[in-house]
Design a protein with these regions (language model features):
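Cross-family detector of peptidyl-prolyl cis-trans isomerase
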Residues: 1-205
Length: 205
């Protein structure tokens, strides 16, 4: 399809090599660049690559959109700091045997399909309120595939919950054990745990 990228690239320091970053930064749309590679990362194989820029976007740093007001009252209550970092009150919630993807903020970006890579910030808790992971605390983002076999694999509950959401959204995910880690212990996550995530969708590629 015309002007539709075959692939996407996050261009920022730390995600690509310094040489690659300097080569690509500042280029305008419809520019084509050809370059040769023969270094320690090419496994002894030289090759030439050509890139054409057909579109670009600037990723968000936190969820941005309209607050959702019709949230079921029995779900955990989420509040946010000024920088967007979420906190949670479990509100006596006991979990669900089914996946619950509840938008808290409805973004105005593209709709996520089952063939996307999504850039997110997230925090995860157990039902007792114990936080077991947070990209906010690490000042990082995560890339997650909504399909199997990609380079950025996440649990099945994440894959299913993100499809149909929109860029800029913040989503509360209740993930039952069978769509999480099942009977496997995963660090601070006990076997057969229901997982609660709040996920900000910053971009979808």
């Amino acid at each position: 399809e015309k002007n539709t990228p075959d692939s996407s690239l996050v261009l920022e320091k730390g995600t690509v090599s310094d040489a690659y970053y300097e080569l690509l930064k500042g280029r305008t749309l419809n520019t084509t660049i050809a370059y040769g590679v023969n270094d320690s990362n090419s496994y002894g194989t030289s090759y030439i690559m050509a890139l054409t820029y057909v579109s670009k976007s600037k990723d968000l740093t936190k969820a941005t959109g309209d607050e959702v007001t019709d949230i079921p009252s029995d779900l955990p209550k989420v509040t946010r700091a000024k920088n967007g970092k979420p906190s949670i009150n479990m509100n006596g919630y006991k979990g669900s045997s089914k996946l619950v993807p509840q938008a808290l903020i409805k973004g105005k970006g593209k709709e996520v399909t089952n063939n996307n890579t999504v850039k997110v910030k997230y925090t995860g808790w157990l039902l007792d309120g114990t936080q077991f992971d947070s990209s906010w605390d690490k000042n990082t983002t995560l890339e997650a595939d909504t399909y199997s076999g990609g380079n950025h694999q996440v649990i099945e509950g994440w894959q299913q919950a993100m499809v149909g959401q929109t860029g800029g959204s913040q989503v509360l995910m209740v993930i039952p054990p069978n769509l999480g880690y099942g009977d496997t212990v995963q660090g601070a996550i006990r076997a057969n745990s229901t997982l609660i995530f709040v996920v900000d969708i910053l971009a979808a590629y």
